[in-house]
A protein has these predicted regions:
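Catalytic strand-loop segment that frames the active site of acyl-thioester-processing enzymes
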Residues: 650-658
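A short helix-loop-beta-strand connector motif used in the catalytic cores of GNAT acetyltransferases and
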Residues: 668-669, 673-687
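Residues that cap or delimit alpha-helices
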Residues: 78, 655-656, 671
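A short beta-loop-alpha structural element at the N-terminal edge
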Residues: 634-646
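A short, aromatic/hydrophobic, helix- or strand-capping loop or linear motif
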Residues: 658-666
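Catalytic-core regions of core metabolic enzymes
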Residues: 1-602
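Divalent-metal-activated hydrolytic enzyme cores
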Residues: 594, 598-621
C-alpha cells in the first residue's frame, strides 16, 4: 500500500513527452498537441532524436539529455524502448511516468523489466495502455483524452480508456469539471487501490467516481476503498454484471462503504450532484413545485428510488401555511399554478428552521407567471436558506447562462425527477452505509487461547497427514472450540421429527468459497419465501462481527422468517474460526435454526496452505501479550471496534492538558464518528 510519488502525478510541476512528434495520427503527436493546447502551467520538454524543434520548442534528443528531472514523463515510444527510457528517467530523478500505448498487457516479460528498471528509483508507472492523467487545476491534460474539462470537485478513476474519453467528453459538453481524471491502463504498478488511497486525503476532491471490471490486489484495494469511503462518497460502476462473480464484487463494495451504481448514466448524474451541489446532510426530502401533476410525477419518482419524503412537524406546516396561505401544505408542497417566483423563495425560508423537512428539491415547469429563469434567480438568492442542501429539476431544460449560475451557487440541476431522485438515493445509500459500518458492535465472546491453539494444531496435523478435508467428528471438534453447537452427523441434515411447530425450524446453508479475486467469502443461502422461487444467496467477506453479520442476513429472505440472533452468533463464530485457523480454505454446512439456537449440521472443512488469503486483515491476535505491572497482570492488545465505550470513558477522564498534548489542540469531546475512527482501525495499514 503506497501513495509514494503520486503527488508528482496529480500535482505536476513539469512534464517531458518522450516521443513527441508531428507525424499525423501518431501517439506522440496526439499527446504533444493535447498538452500544448491545454496550456500546462509548467515547463514542457519534448524528447525525440528526429526533431530539433517542435512548434518553436527546443527538442531533446534523448531522455538522458534533459537538464532536470520532470515531475511526470509521458512515454509515447514503441514498447522496445520502454526499459531504456524508464531507466534514464529514474536516474534523472523523475518520480512518475505514464506509458501511453495501444497495449495494456501488464503480464508480459517486457513490463516486468520496465518495473525492475523503475524500482531502484521509486519511479511510479501508470499503464501500460493508459489514456493519460488529467488535473485541470494546473491545465495538465497529460495523454490523449479527446476533451478538455474544467476544474471540479469530483475525481474520475477508470480501467477503461474508452469510457474515460466518453465521460470527459460528456462533462466538457455540459460545462462540468473534475479534480483529477485517470485511465489506469494495465495497472502494472499504479492501480485503483493506490489512486483511491491518494484521493482519500486530497483536499481538491469531494467525491470519487470509480469504474472497474476487475480488482487486481484485493487486500490493498479493500483497505484503500474503506479509507476513502470514510472520508468522502465513493461511487463505483462495475462492468460485466453477467459475470458469475459479480455478486461477490457487490458484497465487497458494500463492505468497503462504496455505493454501487447500475449504469453509466447513473454515474454521470453524480458528476452533477457531487461536483456541483452541496452534499445533502439529510436522508429525507421535501418536494416544492407549482403543479399537482408535476408533484405527483416527482413523488412517484422518489418512491421508485426508495427515497423517503420527509414527514413535516406541525411547526413546519404552520410556518408554510403562514407564509403561503394559498399553497397546498404538506409534502410535496404545491404552490399552485398561479405561483410567482418569489413564492419558491418564501417556501424555502419557511422550511429552513425545521430539520425534519430534509433536503429541498425544487421541481418546476415554466409558466407565464413563473418562468424558469426567474425561478432560478430566486433559488440563487435564497439558497442560503437551504441548510440541508438543495437540488433542482426544470422541465424543458434551462439556457447555459442559467445553468452556469445555478451551479456557481451550488445548486445541482437534473433533467427529470427520476434522475433527481436516483441521484439523491445514492447519496442516502452512502450515508446509511457509512453509518452501518461505523456502528459499535457488541463484544464477541472471548476465545480461549488454548482452544484456538488446539484448533490450529488439529488443522496442521491433518494437512501434515495428507488430509485436505475434515468432516464428521474431526470437523465438529475443531469448530466447537469456537463456541459453535455442532452435530457431526450429516444424515441429520433433514429436520428432526417430533419437534413442535413453535420451534420454527428453518435450515440455511453456509458455505465458505475461495474466490479468485477476494479470497475466502461466505455464501449464505436461505430457502425461498415461496415454492415458486429459487434459493437466494448473499455474500459477505470475513472477518464478521454481529453488525456485519446482520447486514448479510438482512439481505436474504431469512430475515423475515426466523429468529436472527442465533444465526448472527453462528456466523460470527464461523468467521472467528476462519480467521484464527488459516488452514481453513473452504466450508460447507447446514445451519439449523430454532427460536433459541442455531446448530451446525454435518460441516465439511477444506484445508490448504494460503497465507494472507483474506481480503480484509482480521484482528491480529498474535500481537496480544501480557505483562506484570505494579502487582497486576495486564493484557496489551490491539484496539477493537467494541472498545469504543471504554475508549470514550478513557478520554473523558483525561485532563485538559493531557487532551491538548495527545490531540495537538483544545478538545472538548468526541462524537461517535470520531471515536469510531479511533477504534475501528485497518489492521493492515495501521499496525
Amino acid at each position: 500500500m503506497t501513495v509514494r510519488n503520486l503527488d508528482a502525478l496529480f500535482q505536476p510541476k513539469s512534464v517531458a513527452i518522450i516521443g513527441a512528434s508531428l507525424r499525423p495520427d501518431s501517439v506522440g503527436a496526439k499527446v504533444w498537441r493535447r498538452v500544448r493546447e491545454a496550456g500546462f502551467n509548467g515547463p514542457v520538454w519534448p524528447v525525440n532524436p528526429k526533431y530539433a524543434e517542435l512548434d518553436g520548442c527546443a527538442v531533446f534528443a534523448d531522455a538522458a539529455d534533459l537538464l532536470e528531472a520532470p515531475s511526470v514523463a509521458l512515454i509515447c515510444t514503441p514498447s522496445e524502448t520502454w526499459v531504456d527510457v524508464v531507466g534514464k528517467l529514474g536516474r534523472l530523478g523523475t518520480r512518475a511516468a505514464v506509458i501511453v500505448s495501444d497495449t495494456d498487457d501488464s503480464s508480459s516479460p517486457l513490463v516486468s523489466h520496465v518495473l525492475a528498471a523503475a524500482k531502484p528509483h521509486l519511479l511510479r508507472i501508470v499503464g501500460p495502455g493508459s489514456l493519460g492523467v488529467v488535473t485541470p487545476a494546473v491545465n495538465a491534460h497529460f495523454g490523449a483524452p479527446s476533451a478538455m474539462v474544467k476544474t471540479g470537485g469530483v475525481a474520475w478513476v477508470s480501467q477503461s480508456n474508452a469510457l474515460t474519453n466518453a465521460v470527459l467528453g460528456w462533462a466538457a459538453a455540459r460545462g462540468l469539471g473534475f479534480s483529477h481524471a485517470i485511465a489506469l491502463g494495465g495497472e502494472a504498478d499504479v492501480d485503483a487501490g493506490d489512486v483511491l488511497d491518494y484521493l482519500a486525503s486530497d483536499p481538491a476532491t469531494r467525491a470519487i467516481l470509480l469504474e472497474l471490471s476487475v480488482v487486481r490486489a484485493a487486500r490493498k484495494f479493500m483497505s484503500a476503498a474503506r479509507a476513502a469511503a470514510r472520508n468522502k462518497p465513493v461511487l463505483v460502476l462495475r462492468t460485466g454484471r453477467s459475470d458469475p462473480s459479480d455478486a461477490l464484487y457487490g458484497a465487497a463494495f458494500r463492505r468497503s462503504g462504496m455505493v454501487r451504481v447500475d449504469s453509466l448514466d447513473d454515474l454521470i448524474d453524480e458528476i452533477e450532484t457531487l461536483g456541483v451541489g452541496r452534499i445533502a446532510a439529510s436522508s429525507s426530502a421535501t418536494l416544492v413545485t407549482s403543479d399537482r401533476g408535476v408533484a405527483a410525477l416527482a413523488a412517484d419518482a422518489f418512491a421508485a428510488a426508495n427515497t423517503t419524503l420527509a414527514h413535516w412537524p406541525d411547526a413546519a406546516l404552520a410556518a408554510v401555511a403562514s407564509a403561503l396561505p394559498r399553497a397546498a401544505g404538506g409534502n410535496p408542497l404545491v404552490l399552485g399554478n398561479d405561483a410567482k417566483p418569489e413564492h419558491f423563495g418564501l417556501a424555502l425560508e419557511a422550511l429552513a428552521p425545521h430539520r425534519e423537512t430534509g433536503t429541498a428539491f425544487v421541481v418546476h415547469a415554466s409558466t407565464l407567471g413563473a418562468p424558469v429563469a426567474e425561478v432560478a434567480r430566486v433559488l440563487i438568492e435564497r439558497q442560503r436558506f437551504a441548510y440541508r442542501g438543495m437540488l433542482a429539476c426544470f422541465f424543458g431544460g434551462v439556457d447555459d447562462e442559467t445553468r452556469d449560475a445555478l451551479r456557481a451557487h451550488g445548486i445541482a440541476l437534473h433533467s427529470t425527477p427520476h434522475r433527481l431522485a436516483r441521484a439523491f438515493a445514492r447519496l442516502v445509500d452512502y450515508r446509511l452505509g457509512r453509518e452501518l459500518l461505523m456502528q459499535t458492535p457488541q463484544g464477541l465472546p472471548a476465545q480461549v487461547p488454548v482452544a484456538i491453539e488446539a484448533a490450529q494444531a488439529s488443522a496442521k496435523a491433518a494437512l501434515t497427514a495428507g488430509q485436505t478435508m475434515l468432516e464428521g467428528a474431526d470437523a465438529a471438534s475443531l469448530l466447537s472450540g469456537f463456541g459453535l453447537v455442532v452435530s457431526s452427523d450429516a444424515d441429520s441434515a433433514a429436520p428432526a421429527e417430533g419437534l413442535h411447530d413453535d420451534e420454527h425450524i428453518v435450515d440455511v446453508t453456509v458455505t465458505l468459497r475461495d474466490d479468485a479475486d477476494f479470497g475466502p467469502v461466505f455464501e449464505f443461502t436461505a430457502p425461498p419465501a415461496d415454492e415458486a422461487s429459487a434459493p437466494f444467496s448473499v455474500y459477505g467477506l470475513p472477518p464478521l462481527n454481529p453488525v456485519l453479520a446482520s447486514e448479510i442476513v438482512s439481505r436474504s429472505p431469512y430475515a423475515q422468517r426466523a429468529p436472527v440472533a442465533p444465526v448472527l452468533d453462528a456466523l460470527t463464530a464461523l468467521s472467528e474460526a476462519v480467521c484464527c485457523v488459516e488452514q481453513i480454505v473452504g466450508l460447507t454446512a447446514v445451519l439449523r435454526v430454532t427460536r433459541t439456537r442455531a446448530r451446525l449440521v454435518g460441516p465439511r472443512l477444506a484445508l490448504g496452505q494460503q497465507r494472507g488469503r483474506l481480503a480484509i486483515v482480521p484482528y491480529p491476535r498474535q500481537l496480544e501479550e501480557t505483562l506484570d505491572w505494579r502487582g497486576r497482570r495486564l493484557t496489551i492488545r490491539p484496539i477493537r471496534p467494541e472498545d469504543e465505550p471504554a475508549h470514550s470513558d478513557f478520554i473523558a477522564g483525561m485532563t485538559p492538558n493531557d487532551l491538548r498534548m495527545r490531540f495537538f489542540g483544545a478538545v472538548s469531546g468526541f462524537d461517535h464518528s470520531q471515536l469510531a475512527r479511533m477504534t475501528q482501525i485497518d489492521y493492515d495499514r495501521e499496525m
